[in-house]
Amino acid sequence: MNTQILVFIACVLIEAKGDKICLGHHAVANGTKVNTLTERGIEVVNATETVETANIGKICTQGKRPTDLGQCGLLGTLIGPPQCDQFLEFESNLIIERREGNDVCYPGKFTNEESLRQILRGSGGVDKESMGFTYSGIRTNGTTSACRRSGSSFYAEMKWLLSNSDNAAFPQMTKSYRNPRNKPALIVWGIHHSGSTTEQTRLYGSGNKLITVGSSKYQQSFTPSPGARPQVNGQSGRIDFHWLLLDPNDTVTFTFNGAFIAPNRASFFRGESLGVQSDVPLDSNCGGDCFHSGGTIVSSLPFQNINSRTVGKCPRYVKQPSLLLATGMRNVPENPKTRGLFGAIAGFIENGWEGLIDGWYGFRHQNAQGEGTAADYKSTQSAIDQITGKLNRLIDKTNQQFELIDNEFNEIEQQIGNVINWTRDSMTEVWSYNAELLVAMENQHTIDLADSEMNKLYERVRKQLRENAEEDGTGCFEIFHKCDDQCMESIRNNTYDHTQYRAKSLQNRIQIDPVKLSSGYKDIILWFSFGASCFLLLAIAMGLVFICIKNGNMRCTICI
């Protein structure tokens, strides 16, 4: 009896599609690179620029009361040269000084010029009050061709006191003024330095001249210095202007015997203002609170890279043209090669979902009813709440209203100017470093926070499912019971009741091999098992054939 044994070997791989829920985070195809304390060039989903580089090349005056001084210098509003006649009294919250502006007509200068200029820039304008000085036995109408109106004139707010006639003696005089208001009075007077001793004698008589000024806080004596000097505006003489702030109810007393330029009115400040030196035009159709010589900076950002010398409520100047603040989580673009079932991610921190546009974190699920994706608003909102206001916090730390002293120093003040310039440069260096450090710290916090919220969401789902599901190491959970859309929704909104499905899950869990391997090892083991199984079956078949031939139950005929 011939017995023929036919052996068929078939290897079939069946993919069992069970219910599954996966967790993931938002990703974009091309993120933005930011720096943190520990790393540079980290890619994030969203980032906001913190350095303003856009400038409006005009002085924006919308909502302001600007005063454009034109040819009048700011200090000239106190003494009244012809070019300042329309600004002897004014009110403003934005004072614009022009390069063409001049403080004087008869050559001279102010002492502590920059300090006085800064005071006037913030004064809100000035109004004036007569000091009530009267004179007898002298002339009070001194004029000069350097200050021309219809003809020779003088400073509108000053009186040039001269001897009653050429070469006549100038009498010793004392004049006092008490400040009647409840705010400081600005008092300005001048000392005339004649072009020669002969000129001084002609104007004030012979003998030494001495001017003494005193108040409760101020005491100073002045002696004129006649002498030849280069002519300016046709004059070889000079007038030095001095000033003091007189407290309420305080009295200033002037004692003099010639060469004295007497004040006519005291000046009082009207309020507060900003002062900017600029030659750009004014524009009432735009508004802003930060000004510089080149125009207006309108920005809500904490830093700017436009001009280091600004006035008003301004972003801090930094050297860096860009400092990106992370306002989104770490970005890892979706990689199709690492997807599992229906595009599930392989490692929820290592890869993202580019389609999750309505939230930072979310779920994807698969069940008998199909597949779906939904954002998790709770974790998303938790992260956003902590990151919202990050830019505002930076602005609060950096934005202050301040004014920087300009570099218009005379020779005496040049050393002070050098110190201020060095200090300004040092401050820029410090703030540039501080800005980079602040942004890096905030970026570090944002990225750590985003990862933390992702982990919290993962732990929340794991604690809900407990033994009813098993993690597969890719950010997904294999669920051991049927989980319809309502069940999936309960997992997402944290109302899932694991006890309801415990019995069915335990029954299904017993049928599943508890050992889980990563996909790479699964492939190796699969092929190894397949080869070993085929070899074993082949060995068994050959053994049966050998036994049958030996017992005579099978005959092998070889034909050639």
Swiss-Prot record:
<dbReference type="GO" id="GO:0055036">
    <property type="term" value="C:virion membrane"/>
</dbReference>
<keyword id="KW-0449">Lipoprotein</keyword>
<keyword id="KW-1133">Transmembrane helix</keyword>
<dbReference type="InterPro" id="IPR001364">
    <property type="entry name" value="Hemagglutn_influenz_A/B"/>
</dbReference>
<dbReference type="Pfam" id="PF00509">
    <property type="entry name" value="Hemagglutinin"/>
</dbReference>
<feature type="disulfide bond">
    <location>
        <begin position="290"/>
        <end position="314"/>
    </location>
</feature>
<dbReference type="GO" id="GO:0019064">
    <property type="term" value="P:fusion of virus membrane with host plasma membrane"/>
</dbReference>
<keyword id="KW-0348">Hemagglutinin</keyword>
<feature type="site" description="Cleavage; by host">
    <location>
        <begin position="339"/>
        <end position="340"/>
    </location>
</feature>
<keyword id="KW-1165">Clathrin-mediated endocytosis of virus by host</keyword>
<keyword id="KW-0472">Membrane</keyword>
<comment type="function">
    <text>Binds to sialic acid-containing receptors on the cell surface, bringing about the attachment of the virus particle to the cell. This attachment induces virion internalization either through clathrin-dependent endocytosis or through clathrin- and caveolin-independent pathway. Plays a major role in the determination of host range restriction and virulence. Class I viral fusion protein. Responsible for penetration of the virus into the cell cytoplasm by mediating the fusion of the membrane of the endocytosed virus particle with the endosomal membrane.</text>
</comment>
<dbReference type="GO" id="GO:0075512">
    <property type="term" value="P:clathrin-dependent endocytosis of virus by host cell"/>
</dbReference>
<dbReference type="GO" id="GO:0016020">
    <property type="term" value="C:membrane"/>
</dbReference>
<dbReference type="InterPro" id="IPR000149">
    <property type="entry name" value="Hemagglutn_influenz_A"/>
</dbReference>
<feature type="disulfide bond">
    <location>
        <begin position="60"/>
        <end position="286"/>
    </location>
</feature>
<keyword id="KW-0946">Virion</keyword>
<dbReference type="GO" id="GO:0046789">
    <property type="term" value="F:host cell surface receptor binding"/>
</dbReference>
<feature type="disulfide bond">
    <location>
        <begin position="105"/>
        <end position="147"/>
    </location>
</feature>
<dbReference type="GO" id="GO:0020002">
    <property type="term" value="C:host cell plasma membrane"/>
</dbReference>
<keyword id="KW-1160">Virus entry into host cell</keyword>
<comment type="subunit">
    <text>Homotrimer of disulfide-linked HA1-HA2.</text>
</comment>
<keyword id="KW-1168">Fusion of virus membrane with host membrane</keyword>
<keyword id="KW-1043">Host membrane</keyword>
<keyword id="KW-0812">Transmembrane</keyword>
<keyword id="KW-1161">Viral attachment to host cell</keyword>
<comment type="similarity">
    <text>Belongs to the influenza viruses hemagglutinin family.</text>
</comment>
<keyword id="KW-1015">Disulfide bond</keyword>
<feature type="signal peptide">
    <location>
        <begin position="1"/>
        <end position="18"/>
    </location>
</feature>
<protein>
    <recommendedName>
        <fullName>Hemagglutinin</fullName>
    </recommendedName>
</protein>
<feature type="glycosylation site" description="N-linked (GlcNAc...) asparagine; by host">
    <location>
        <position position="30"/>
    </location>
</feature>
<feature type="lipid moiety-binding region" description="S-palmitoyl cysteine; by host">
    <location>
        <position position="556"/>
    </location>
</feature>
<keyword id="KW-0732">Signal</keyword>
<feature type="lipid moiety-binding region" description="S-palmitoyl cysteine; by host">
    <location>
        <position position="559"/>
    </location>
</feature>
<dbReference type="GO" id="GO:0019062">
    <property type="term" value="P:virion attachment to host cell"/>
</dbReference>
<feature type="glycosylation site" description="N-linked (GlcNAc...) asparagine; by host">
    <location>
        <position position="249"/>
    </location>
</feature>
<feature type="topological domain" description="Extracellular">
    <location>
        <begin position="19"/>
        <end position="523"/>
    </location>
</feature>
<feature type="disulfide bond">
    <location>
        <begin position="483"/>
        <end position="487"/>
    </location>
</feature>
<feature type="transmembrane region" description="Helical">
    <location>
        <begin position="524"/>
        <end position="544"/>
    </location>
</feature>
<feature type="disulfide bond" description="Interchain (between HA1 and HA2 chains)">
    <location>
        <begin position="22"/>
        <end position="476"/>
    </location>
</feature>
<keyword id="KW-1167">Clathrin- and caveolin-independent endocytosis of virus by host</keyword>
<feature type="glycosylation site" description="N-linked (GlcNAc...) asparagine; by host">
    <location>
        <position position="46"/>
    </location>
</feature>
